[in-house]
From Swiss-Prot:
Induction behaviour: Expressed equally in exponential and stationary phase in rich medium (at protein level). A shorter isoform that starts downstream at a TTG codon (yielding a 13 residue peptide) may also be expressed.
Protein name (record): Protein YqhJ
More info: Encoded antisense to yghE; it is entirely within the yghE coding region.
Organism: Escherichia coli (strain K12)
């Protein structure tokens, strides 16, 4: 679901990596 957060935030690169 990292892509979902990416679409919402747009720059969740560090976020998806943390998950």
């Amino acid at each position: 679901m990292k892509y979902l957060a990416f679409l919402i935030k747009g720059k969740t690169t560090h976020f998806d990596v943390g998950k």
